[in-house]
């Protein structure tokens, strides 16, 4: 099985102020041998990182396999977004693209983000929706 680790996990895992129990909860997912990255996730994480954090994150990301984002996935992301709108949900654009990448590669998205639940309800997206520990 291929896991696609979403931005929400990477942000909490790499943020210095995240509590240790949260990082320990996330660690098995980001360290899983089947964990993969996708370019939209890389973009989301690195665009918000400070320069010194970005260098460390790039080094870590370079150790992970990256799922490709073929150009036709943009159209699939649009279709997913339209399907979500039909059920009354507006989903962030990059989440739609991450879902399209996961569907293309038959990967399971691992995320704290509930936008993926809406996408999974209108598609064949495989999702492991996590809840942050209290």
Where are the language model's segments positioned?
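Short, well-structured N-terminal submotif of metal-dependent ribonuclease cores
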Residues: 1-37, 46-59, 134
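Acidic, PIN/NYN-like endoribonuclease modules and their adjacent C-terminal/linker elements
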Residues: 1-2, 99, 103-134
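A secondary-structure boundary/capping signal
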Residues: 6-7, 41, 112
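Generic structural signal for small/hydrophobic residues in well-ordered secondary structure
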Residues: 6-7, 45, 77, 102
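A general structural signal for well-ordered alpha-helical segments in protein cores
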Residues: 22-23, 42, 54-57, 74-77, ...
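General small-molecule cofactor/ligand-binding pocket signal
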Residues: 36, 67, 128
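Residues at the C-termini of beta-strands that transition into short coil/loop
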Residues: 39, 70, 131-133
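Active-site neighborhoods of divalent-metal-dependent phosphate/nucleic-acid chemistry enzymes
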Residues: 65-112
């Amino acid at each position: 099985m291929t896991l696609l680790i979403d931005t929400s996990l990477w942000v909490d895992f790499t943020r210095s102020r995240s509590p240790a129990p949260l990082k320990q909860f996330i660690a098995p997912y980001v360290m899983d041998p089947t964990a993969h990255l996708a370019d939209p996730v890389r973009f989301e994480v690195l665009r918000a990182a400070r320069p010194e954090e970005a260098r460390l994150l790039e080094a870590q990301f370079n150790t992970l396999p990256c799922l490709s984002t073929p150009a036709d996935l943009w159209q699939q992301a649009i279709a997913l977004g339209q399907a979500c709108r039909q059920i009354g949900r507006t989903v962030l654009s990059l989440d739609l693209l991450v879902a399209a990448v996961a569907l293309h590669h038959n990967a399971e998205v691992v995320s704290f983000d509930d936008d993926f639940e809406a996408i999974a309800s209108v598609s064949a997206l495989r999702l492991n929706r996590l809840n942050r520990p209290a």
